[in-house]
């Protein structure tokens, strides 16, 4: 295990299966606990593996969070690519694309709430450069594609600066969804069901652009 990489990549299918079990178990535990509260012994016990198997793949507990981080962003980029193809965005209206994007973000943050809460806390409190680099890479992968598709419908946008409106409106929608899903449990008076959160976030973006709902 090199100094540069605290995660030992599995070389065999069995080793990959064990690693996936550890990551899946850790992600499930993080839905109920913070990363500081999570313990290696708890993870391996629930994963049905051993402490030795854990340290054979991860240098320490921090490496586990890094692996969860890397897996999330790999899935995020893959899922976004599939979304565009499956929903045929080349032939959809601007409002449909925005609603699809809001649903996608809500599903991503619902599916990985515990992991993303832990990653965001670590990035904020410890200035984790690796997380920030992967977050920027995911953003640079997603946003330009979305921007291009939305600006193909610039004639529908009545905001005086369509480019600015798309950039600002998307960030507004993205960060609103993230904050509600990661920290909403701390604000009992501001909780919404997932469908409402998705629909209202999309409607706010569409309204800001000055686009008529289609």
Q: Each PLM stretch: what is its role?
A:
Residues 70-97:
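Amphipathic alpha-helical linker/stalk segments
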Residues 77-82, 96, 107-114, 118-121, ...:
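Amphipathic alpha-helical packing segments from all-alpha helical-bundle domains
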